[in-house]
């Protein structure tokens, strides 16, 4: 056996159906699509969720919830990221200059992840309990 002598098993490859080529073929005239109706038309497919005119399930169920827009103006800052900030007093402006937050951010919260290597004063930012303890352990302080 060689690569150039390989052939598919008998019955494996079937020729494609040629439809609409006369009544003798068995697939003439309507080409196996039946008479009229959506599925007989060209481009005729039933849209997902369509239930024949009955009110579809996704419209029968109630709406719920909403997308909170506060996340668009809030940021989470890791404790280890504070090492990148040059300033001794860390506030929103200092975070912006250090390129840790974007210009549309109005509030930020510092959480405990990594370690702080220098003493800093955090001003006007929300701080978790663990992060506050770590900042104070590094010799810094948290101001409201």
UniProtKB/Swiss-Prot annotation:
Can you list the GO cellular component terms from the UniProt entry? cytosolic large ribosomal subunit
Q: Which gene encodes it?
A: rplO
Q: Which GO terms describe its molecular function?
A: rRNA binding; structural constituent of ribosome
Query: What are the TM regions of this chain, as residue ranges?
Result: none
Which Gene3D superfamilies does its entry note? 3.100.10.10
The name on file for this protein is Large ribosomal subunit protein uL15
State the organism's lineage: Bacteria, Pseudomonadati, Pseudomonadota, Gammaproteobacteria, Cellvibrionales
Q: What family does this belong to?
A: Belongs to the universal ribosomal protein uL15 family.
One matching Pfam family is Ribosomal_L27A
> What is the species listed in this Swiss-Prot or TrEMBL entry?
Teredinibacter turnerae (strain ATCC 39867 / T7901)
* Role according to the record: Binds to the 23S rRNA.
How does this protein assemble?
Answer: Part of the 50S ribosomal subunit.
Record's InterPro entries?
Answer: Ribosomal_uL15, Ribosomal_uL15/eL18, Ribosomal_uL15/eL18_sf, Ribosomal_uL15_bac-type
């Amino acid at each position: 056996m060689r690569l150039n002598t390989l052939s598919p098993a008998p019955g494996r490859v079937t020729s494609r159906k040629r439809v609409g080529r006369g009544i003798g073929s068995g697939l003439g005239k309507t080409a196996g699509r039946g008479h009229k109706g959506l599925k007989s038309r060209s481009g005729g497919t039933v849209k997902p969720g369509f239930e024949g005119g009955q009110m579809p399930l996704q419209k029968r169920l109630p709406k719920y919830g909403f997308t909170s827009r506060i996340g668009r103006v809030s940021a989470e800052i890791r404790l280890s990221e504070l090492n990148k900030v040059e300033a001794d007093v860390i506030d929103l402006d200092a975070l912006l200059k250090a390129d840790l937050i974007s210009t549309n951010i109005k509030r930020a919260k510092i959480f405990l992840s990594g370690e702080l290597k220098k003493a800093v004063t955090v001003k006007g930012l929300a701080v978790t309990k663990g992060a506050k303890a770590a900042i104070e352990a590094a010799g810094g302080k948290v101001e409201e």
